Amino acid sequence: MTSIKPAVEPPAPDHPAVTALPGIGARPAARPPVTSRWRWVPAFFGWFVGIQAILNFLSSISPFIRMVTKLPREFVDEYLFGWPDGSLSWAFVLSLLAAALAVRKSIAWWVLLIDLLGRSALNVGGFIEHRDTTELIGLVVHGAFILLLLLARKEFYAKVRRGATVKAALVLIAGMAAGTVLAWGLLELFPRTLVPGDRFWWALNRVAGFSIASHRDFDGLPPHFLNWLFGLFGALALIAAAIVLFRSQRAVNALTGDDESLIRGLLERYGQDDSLGYFATRRDKAVIFAPNGRAAVTYRVEVGVCLVSADPIGDKSAWGQAISAWLQVCDAYGWAPAVMGASAEGALAYREHGLNALELGDEAILYPRSFSISGPHMATVRQAVNRARRSGLSVRIRRHRELSAEETKQIIVNADLWRDGNTERGFSMALGRLGDSTDGDCLLVEAIDSTGDPVAMLSLVPWGTNGVSLELMRRSRQSPNGTIEFMVTELLTRAEGMGITRVSLNFVMFRSVYADGSRIGAGPVLRLWRSVLMFASRFWQFEQLYRSNVKYQPEWVPRFACYEDARLIPRIGIASVIAEGFLVLPFGNRDKPRHTGQYSAVPQAIVATGLLHHDGSTPELLPQTAPQQRVPEQVKVRLGKLAALQEKGIDTYPVGSPPSHTVAEALAAPDGSEVVISGRLLRIRDYGGVLFAQLRDWSAEVQLLIDDPRLHEEFTAAVDLGDLVEASGVMGQSNNGTRSVLVESWRIIGKCLHPLPDKRKGLTDPEARVRARYLDLAINPEAREQIAARSAIITSLRNTLLAQGFLEVETPILQQVHGGANARPFLTHINAYNLDLYLRIAPELYLKRLCVGGVEKVFELGRAFRNEGVDFSHNPEFTLLEAYQAHADYVTWAQTTQRLIQNAAKAAHGAEVVMRPGADGRLAPVDIGGEWPIVPVHEAVSRALGEEVNAATEVPTLQRFCQSAEVQFNPRWDAGHLVLELYERLVEKHTTSPTFYSDFPVSVSPLTRPHRSIAGLAERWDLVAWGVELGTAYTELTDPVEQRRRLYEQSLLAAGGDAEAMELDEDFLRAMEYAMAPTGGMGMGVDRVVMLITGRSIRETLPFPLAKPR
């Protein structure tokens, strides 16, 4: 958060989350580096004591094992470690000690050390008293273990609950006392032979002394079953004390007002991505912030698992620091780190810090723009909505802040009344509070019956600034079927009016199991797993949740669980069940509506800003500033000049006022003429007393002359090359006779912040010229000539047709059917109609509709799009001229097309010439005047092959010709396609001066009329010049029956996978059935005509050709 970033980053006092953290500039590590040679010791003692606990347990429940292990058990119990006969309680205590040792609990180290020291003392005493060398064996073992514990002392760093030792001692004393008193009372009732004076001491010995005194020390014996019961009393007291002593530190601290305020600030600034981010404000969670306060993770601790919900919140660049701080806290307290409900991006961040990720399920996301209940796949929802409407339901949608106090109370009452169960469930995907003043942006959707009473509600929390995430769903048992569907549909229908573009519904665990497990071919393991979940759904409604969401056809977004050790997954599962409220423990801290935190986790430097609110509301955020960019030194200098000018009150980007002259007009004006000109400075020469500058506008370039000392000083201090300048003065000449503007005043009208390329060399890299066309135009006269020539050519094409009485029209670019040419289209989608559309490959079919309507001369000059290759003559979007004339044919259009191109060449060059590279590589004019030849395509192919080819030549012969000419072909092609391939490879590429190739096979001309005299041919020509096809023309096919047959054949090719084949356009065919006059049509690639006339490539002639991403 830029607005509350501290100047320094001290750790927050009294909070473990920010102690001993790496610096912000360093990459945080998931764990401290493992360099200690004693790192293995806690695991060793954990396993050692754990095995002892297992053996104790087995010998306690199995007489056979107890008999087999009698001798070693007695030896171990006497000389090494405690192994009482048949004590389940002792096995339980040992298992708790083993677990505490494994997670590095410092208190477990002390317990084991004290136990070993005590047993060592007993061994020493036994040796002194009995001189038994066996005592020395035990002493050596104890000494080795004690030494190992002392050497590894720093490895047992995990903290325990504050005051856990005192609490454990009090529990033990209280338990022993209660057990002793109860045992004494039972002995008074059932003494058997035990004398009254020994009854209290017997009870104390059995309960608290674990039978240290022998029964021979007492007068008489109690009943046998009481002895077992008294031992159980002592064992229970010991177990309770051990649980208190060794159980994991639990995070009793929850959010404070400052914590929540900073979390809300992070959500306000960075909370656009995670739909679960707002649930971080749940007040029964604790929080750990990154040291700089720009990111945080929220968590709860259950059964020793530190459970984080969803992704970290805040700046993604600080996520690593927050995760690292959280993992260090887990280490400090011996918690097992785990995450529930992380997104794919969040799971990746956790994985980078040493955790593993497991897909948990999917979240259902709906987008109002594309949501619709029409169509067969939404029949269930549509029927439910109609049913709810018929029952008289209506829907009311409001923000929580719009509710009155009475309405809020009633909402809370209804939510409690309609809740299914006694416990409010949720942790990672539920808020757990209603009616809080800080949640005013939450959305309430209510279903209202015909009497005006609410019968159901949805509460949704904010998801960034343009989304909502479902938090609460309630309905009365009296609400009609379809109520929930009605509310969801109405929410999505009205969402865009409320600025909502995305809605997150429920999270569905194991969604893929339900989706894939019922499909044909699902494996036995998947089917078994689905059956298990189906059974579990009787209790937890997993399947019902899936069914209730899948009917809306949502987008499923995966969510992940993250963990450190796979062996801890069962415990993590239990912790998740507890956190989500499916298992309720006594003395829980769920659903706290108020702040109960004892201390704030916010870094002190942020607290000191005073921007946070103690009630937890969103802090006062300063406007977000753009990130600082590293700029070159020359740019820094120019920015400095800009700032200096602005400080003086000079507007460096003023409102425009037209100059009195262009540069060309000023140069034509006589000396002494007053002129005001503007343009870009391309060169500055300072000779001390006089300054010369070259100024260029679109028309020409002129020299500025400044000899006034004041103007000279101001100009040199403020101006750089590339600046746009307006200069006023009189026309004159310099000493060497150069025409100049003698400057009397000037002003900057646009400060250039980057240096220009070299004026003489310009942009030498062709790719740079494409990407920075604006610079190329600014400094390169040839680039200006190209764009001017293109404009002149397009204007000439338009004017030539307009002069012949043609109408210019515009037809749709977005089309439902791609047709008019054989080419691969671009596909897009319109959300309003949930409909796929194509960018047009040609306007032909719409122009022909106009011809059917009686427009006799019509043309369109516009953009077309083809998803094909990019090279010197192809660009994915291009300018296309298509024109149609009634009562004309392809011969008519040959004459018109020749005239169009010759006129365009004259407009660009002043003569009917095109520019072609000469022998020296330089462009030279080539005359294209006169009549252009018309050559039948079969004749041209025959010349190229040296073999006779005509319309009757059969396929095998044409295939043989292709093989001999090394022309590749598809064996399934007919004769027409083979001739076309031979033409394109052998004729078109080798053509020089403009030539019309005519009479193509019918099979490659689906929209062309059959030749009037030669069967199998179509009245079509292609115009080719210097290896490039410039255009094509047809005598149009006007027979609707034949047209339908040909387009049907094309549609079969499209259905068979031919991406370039035309689809069947029924609207076009229906229009043709109303009859179109005999018509000739022509299509011309305008970009290629510009290339022909200027001698440049398509990338040079287009102002902005498509360039690869950087």
Curated annotation (Swiss-Prot):
Any one of the GO CC terms: cytosol
Chain intervals for the UniProt region annotation (Phosphatidylglycerol lysyltransferase): 1-620
Reaction it catalyzes: tRNA(Lys) + L-lysine + ATP = L-lysyl-tRNA(Lys) + AMP + diphosphate; L-lysyl-tRNA(Lys) + a 1,2-diacyl-sn-glycero-3-phospho-(1'-sn-glycerol) = a 1,2-diacyl-sn-glycero-3-phospho-1'-(3'-O-L-lysyl)-sn-glycerol + tRNA(Lys)
Positions of Mg(2+) 2 binding: E1029
Pfam families the record matches: LPG_synthase_C, tRNA-synt_2, tRNA-synt_2_TM, tRNA_anti-codon
Membrane topology, from the record: Multi-pass membrane protein
Cell compartments where the protein resides: Cell membrane
Presence of keyword Chloroplast: no
Chain intervals for the UniProt region annotation (Lysine--tRNA ligase): 621-1110
Residue ranges of the annotated DNA-binding region, renumbered to this chain: 675-749
Keywords, in A-Z order: Aminoacyl-tRNA synthetase, Antibiotic resistance, ATP-binding, Cell membrane, DNA-binding, Ligase, Lipid metabolism, Magnesium, Membrane, Metal-binding, Multifunctional enzyme, Nucleotide-binding, Transferase, Transmembrane, Transmembrane helix, Virulence
Gene Ontology MF annotations: ATP binding; DNA binding; lysine-tRNA ligase activity; magnesium ion binding; phosphatidylglycerol lysyltransferase activity; tRNA binding
Sequence positions that bind Mg(2+) 1: D1022, E1029
PROSITE patterns cross-referenced by the UniProt entry: AA_TRNA_LIGASE_II
Enzyme Commission designation: 6.1.1.6, 2.3.2.3
Cofactor(s) of this protein: Mg(2+)
Biological process according to GO: lipid metabolic process; lysyl-tRNA aminoacylation; response to antibiotic
Keyword Glycosyltransferase attached: no
Residue ranges of the TM segments: 41-61, 83-103, 107-127, 132-152, 170-190, 225-245, 568-588
Cofactor, free-text remark: Binds 3 Mg(2+) ions per subunit.
Membership in a protein family: In the N-terminal section; belongs to the LPG synthetase family.
Function summary: Catalyzes the production of L-lysyl-tRNA(Lys)transfer and the transfer of a lysyl group from L-lysyl-tRNA(Lys) to membrane-bound phosphatidylglycerol (PG), which produces lysylphosphatidylglycerol (LPG), one of the components of the bacterial membrane with a positive net charge. LPG synthesis contributes to the resistance to cationic antimicrobial peptides (CAMPs) and likely protects M.tuberculosis against the CAMPs produced by competiting microorganisms (bacteriocins).
Protein name per UniProt: Lysylphosphatidylglycerol biosynthesis bifunctional protein LysX
Gene designation per UniProt: lysX
